[in-house]
């Protein structure tokens, strides 16, 4: 998760929300991504989406069955759907996202039993450090706390 936090901080250079994601296969990082919405002017360029695309390109297959995705923040509903489509087996994230989170905060996408793929998940890893990073960012950018 420490590496994911480092990746998230790259977004700060572009004044974007500091969210980072890495994809790990067989204990090795194969891809990473950070929020790039401000740079690309594309609201779908979330850290998780970028990391998933890069991982698929790296291994030459969209099926990331043996991979774990680490993210600083709870994946949103869109990213949770992408994680299912890429067949990620496990997701670990630092802290919840009460407004748009799609894993535990709102729609709980991974808990839908009728889907053809299931994802194990864990959260709360480095939670206070990540909350502090998010709080500092939003206080600076919007004058209010996340």
What are these regions (language model features)?
Residues 21, 60-61, 111-113:
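Short secondary-structure boundary/capping segments
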Residues 30-37:
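Short beta->alpha transition motifs characteristic of CBS
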Residues 37, 71, 95:
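Residues that line or immediately flank small-molecule/substrate-binding pockets and catalytic motifs
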Residues 41-45, 49-84:
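Helix-adjacent hinge/juxtasegments
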């Amino acid at each position: 998760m420490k590496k994911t936090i480092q990746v998230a901080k790259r977004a700060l250079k572009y004044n974007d929300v500091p969210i980072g994601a890495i994809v790990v296969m067989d204990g090795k990082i194969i891809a990473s991504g950070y929020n790039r919405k401000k740079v690309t002017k594309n609201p779908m360029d979330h850290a998780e989406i970028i990391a998933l695309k890069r991982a698929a390109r790296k291994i030459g297959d969209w099926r990331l069955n043996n991979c774990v995705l680490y993210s600083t923040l709870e994946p949103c509903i869109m990213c949770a759907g992408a994680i299912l489509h890429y067949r990620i087996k496990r997701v670990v994230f630092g802290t919840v996202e009460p407004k748009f989170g799609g894993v535990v905060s709102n729609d709980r996408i991974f808990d839908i039993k009728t889907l053809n793929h299931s994802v194990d998940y864990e959260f709360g890893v480095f939670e206070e450090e990540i909350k502090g990073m998010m709080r500092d960012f939003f206080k600076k950018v919007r004058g209010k706390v996340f």
